């Protein structure tokens, strides 16, 4: 279901100058919450940006009737520290510092250099590139440094 929602709102969000990072549907205390995460290619995502996107996509979602139950729409930035799960997440996070845990229990910190649909390239501290297939990744999380 979130894939259909993503397909419907992505073009609208891009027309406003933002990138759609993620869509998730969760249930908290019997309430359905549709979370839409944005990236602003020109800087930070502000509260005004979130409000603008919310006001545009809310009626669109109501008309499409993807969700049968009542829900709360939450629009936010993708966040400074987040877990990368899909090739799209990796592509939208190029150049960021990440903590990587592999399936073989190896872990390291690196800069995310490149990503495609099969693998991702990390620049290690010694400036070498380590290429890893998605299937070999256990967890990758962006790191924010103050």
UniProtKB/Swiss-Prot annotation:
GO terms for cellular component: cytosol. It is found in: Cytoplasm. Keywords: Cytoplasm, Ribosome biogenesis. Pfam families: DUF150_C (PF17384), RimP_N (PF02576). GO terms for biological process: ribosomal small subunit assembly; translation. Its main location: cytoplasm. It comes from the Bacteria. Required for maturation of 30S ribosomal subunits. Belongs to the RimP family. This is Ribosome maturation factor RimP. The lineage of its organism: Bacteria, Pseudomonadati, Campylobacterota, Epsilonproteobacteria, Campylobacterales. The gene is rimP.
């Amino acid at each position: 279901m979130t894939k259909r929602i993503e397909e419907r709102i992505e073009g609208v969000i891009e027309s406003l100058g933002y990138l759609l990072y993620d869509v998730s549907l969760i249930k908290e205390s019997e309430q359905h919450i549709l979370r839409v995460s944005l990236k602003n290619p020109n800087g930070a995502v502000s509260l005004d940006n979130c409000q603008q996107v919310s006001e545009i996509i809310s009626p669109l979602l109501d008309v499409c009737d993807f969700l049968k139950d009542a829900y709360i729409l939450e629009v936010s930035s993708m966040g400074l520290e987040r877990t990368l799960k899909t090739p799209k997440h990796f592509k939208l996070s190029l150049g960021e510092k990440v903590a990587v845990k592999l399936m073989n229990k190896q872990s390291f910190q690196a800069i995310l250099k490149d990503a495609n649909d099969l693998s991702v390239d990390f620049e290690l501290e010694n400036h070498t590139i380590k290429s890893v297939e998605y299937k070999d990744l256990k967890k990758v999380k962006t790191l924010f440094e103050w």
